[in-house]
Regions:
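Active-site phosphate-binding and catalytic loops of NTP-dependent enzymes
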Residues: 38-41, 61-68, 83-94, 136-153, ...
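Solvent-exposed alpha-helical segments within well-ordered globular domains of core cellular machineries
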Residues: 20, 24, 28, 32, ...
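AAA+ ATPase "lid" subdomain C-terminal helix
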Residues: 162-164, 356-366, 379
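Switch/coupling sub-region of P-loop NTPases
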Residues: 201, 205-217, 226, 230-353, ...
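N-terminal anchoring/assembly modules that precede and organize ATP-driven motor systems
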Residues: 1-117
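Conserved glycine(s) of the Walker
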Residues: 223
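NTP-binding/hydrolysis catalytic cores, primarily Walker-type P-loop NTPases
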Residues: 366-440
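P-loop NTP-binding catalytic core
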Residues: 94, 102, 107-210
C-alpha cells in the first residue's frame, strides 16, 4: 500500500525521510483530534501521555517507517509544538541557558555563562516561527501583525519575551527571551562566583540595613536585577515593601510584599498603566521601602521624590556604563518627566535622593562583577560629588581566558559610616584601607 509519505522516504531509506512535512501534518491532525474541553482539565503529565498516545495512533494509521529513536524524537517535537514553544522548548527547559535569541527562522543563539553560542536548532520556515510568536503573544492577550509589529510579553514561568516581525525585522521575525531564574541567589553565591568579596558583601548588607537609597547601574545583562534581588533580601522582615516592575522578575523572600506590574495597552490602544502611575499609587499604600525593577523614563522623577520624602532605603536599577554616566542618565530621565528645573537645582535634588551607586559590569570572559561602589556626598558648585569607595581593577587573563583582578579601596572613608555607628551596625574600618588588596 502506498502512503503520502512514500514520496519522501521508504523503509530502505529511513535516514533520508524528511520529518518536517510529517511533523506539520501530524501537528494539524493532533490539534483537530484533541477535545479541548478535556485537555483543559489535564495536568502536564496527563496531557503529555495523551499526546504520545494520539501521535502513535496517527503514525500507525499512516504506516510511516520510523525507527524507535525517530518515533520518540517526533513525539517529543509534537509535544513541544502543542504544549510549549516548538523548537525553542528544549532551550526554555535548559537551566544553563540565560537568553534565547532568534535572529531569523534558521539562526538561533543562546547565552550561557555570559557567552553567546550559535545552536543547530531551526524553525521549518518563517511561517513556523510566526506561529510560535503568535502563540506566545495570544497567551497574554496581545496581538502582533503589520499594524502592531512589536510586542513585549511574558511566559508563564516569568521569562521576558520581545518579538518583532517584518517589515521592521528585515531578515524575518525575531524573538528575544530573557529567561526567569527560579534560583533565589544569595550574597554568598556572588562571593563564590568572585563577583565581589566577603568584606564588600557585609558592607552592602549594612548599607541596606542603614536605609541608604541605592541606585544599581550597568549595561544589559550585567546582573543588575540579580544584585537588586539579593540586596532586597537584606530588608528587615517587619518592613512593608512595594515592588514596581515593567515585567515581574523580582523574587523577594519577605512576607510583607506587595508586587505591582505595569500593563500595556490593549489591542485598541487603551488601558495602559505606566510605572509613573504605579509609583504615584504606591505612595498611597504606606510603603516603608520601594523597590523598582528599573527606571527608564519619567518615573525616575517620581522615584527620586519618593526617596526624598521619607521612603529611605529604596532601591532601583538604571542602564549606564559608569557611575558618572549613571547620574547624567538620571538627569535625562527626569527631564523626560517634563520637570523644568535649573541644572543646579536638579542636580541638588538628585544628590539629596541617592546615597550609593553600585556599578555592575559584564567582563570579557562573560563573568559579571560589581566594578565600583560609590557614595554621593553632595554638591561642589554645579557638580554632584561622587566618591568611589571600592573599585575592581582587571589585572589579566589566565590560560582559560578567565578574568583575574583585584578589589581595591580608594582610601576614602564613606560618610555613611557615621550612620552605621548611630544605628549600631558594625563595620570593619580596615576594609577602607587602600593598602589592602582583595584578589579575585
Amino acid at each position: 500500500m502506498t502512503t503520502q509519505w512514500d514520496e519522501v522516504g521508504s523503509v530502505a531509506g529511513v535516514g533520508s525521510l524528511d520529518l518536517g512535512p510529517l511533523k506539520e501534518s501530524l501537528h494539524r491532525q493532533v490539534i483537530d483530534s484533541l477535545d479541548l474541553t478535556i485537555i483543559a482539565k489535564l495536568d502536564g503529565g496527563q496531557l503529555k501521555a495523551e499526546l504520545s498516545k494520539l501521535v502513535t495512533e496517527l503514525l500507525e494509521s499512516e504506516s510511516v517507517p520510523l525507527s524507535m529513536k525517530e518515533r520518540e524524537e517526533l513525539i517529543s517535537d509534537i509535544q513541544h509544538e502543542v504544549m510549549g514553544l516548538g523548537p525553542l522548548e528544549p532551550l526554555v527547559q535548559d537551566q544553563t541557558v540565560n537568553d534565547i535569541l532568534v535572529n531569523r527562522c534558521d539562526q538561533i543563539y543562546v547565552e550561557r555563562a555570559g557567552k553567546l553560542e550559535l545552536t543547530d536548532i531551526k524553525f521549518r520556515d518563517e511561517g513556523h516561527l510566526r506561529k510560535i510568536i503568535e502563540k506566545i503573544v495570544s497567551a497574554v492577550g496581545r496581538r502582533i501583525d503589520e499594524s502592531s509589529p512589536m510586542v513585549d510579553a511574558r511566559l508563564l514561568d516569568g521569562s521576558r519575551v520581545n518579538a518583532i516581525i517584518p517589515p521592521l525585522a528585515l531578515d524575518g521575525s525575531s524573538i528575544s527571551i530573557r529567561k526567569f531564574s527560579k534560583d533565589k541567589l544569595q550574597i554568598t553565591d556572588l562571593v563564590e562566583k568572585r563577583s565581589l568579596t566577603p568584606e564588600i558583601a557585609e558592607l552592602l548588607r549594612g548599607i541596606v540595613e542603614a536605609r541608604l537609597n541605592i541606585l544599581i547601574s550597568g549595561g544589559t545583562g550585567t546582573g543588575k536585577t540579580t544584585i537588586l534581588n539579593i540586596l532586597s533580601s537584606f530588608i528587615p522582615t517587619d518592613e512593608r515593601i512595594v515592588t514596581i516592575e515593567d515585567s515581574a522578575e523580582l523574587q523577594l523572600r519577605q512576607e510583607h510584599v506587595v508586587r505591582l506590574e505595569t500593563r500595556p495597552p490593549n489591542v485598541e490602544g487603551r488601558g495602559e498603566v505606566s510605572q509613573r502611575e504605579l509609583v504615584k499609587n504606591c505612595l498611597r499604600m504606606r510603603p516603608d521601602r520601594i523597590v523598582m525593577g528599573e527606571v527608564r523614563s519619567g518615573e525616575c522623577l517620581d522615584m527620586l521624590q519618593a526617596m526624598n520624602t521619607g521612603h529611605d532605603g529604596s532601591l532601583t536599577t538604571i542602564h549606564a556604563n559608569t557611575p558618572r554616566d549613571c547620574l547624567t542618565r538620571v538627569e535625562t530621565l527626569v527631564a523626560m518627566a517634563g520637570l523644568n528645573l535649573a541644572t543646579k537645582a536638579l542636580r541638588h535634588y538628585i544628590s539629596s535622593a541617592i546615597d550609593v551607586v553600585l556599578q555592575m559590569t559584564r567582563l570579557s570572559d562573560g563573568s559579571r562583577k560589581m566594578t565600583s561602589l560609590s557614595e554621593i556626598v553632595g554638591m561642589e558648585g554645579e557638580t554632584i560629588t561622587l566618591q568611589e569607595i571600592f573599585l575592581f581593577k582587571q589585572t589579566g587573563l589566565d590560560e582559560q581566558r578567565k578574568v583575574h583582578g583585584t578589589f581595591m579601596a580608594s582610601g576614602v572613608r564613606p560618610k555613611f559610616v557615621e550612620r552605621f555607628k548611630a544605628l549600631g551596625i558594625a563595620v570593619d574600618a580596615d576594609i577602607f584601607d587602600p593598602e589592602k588588596i582583595y584578589e579575585v
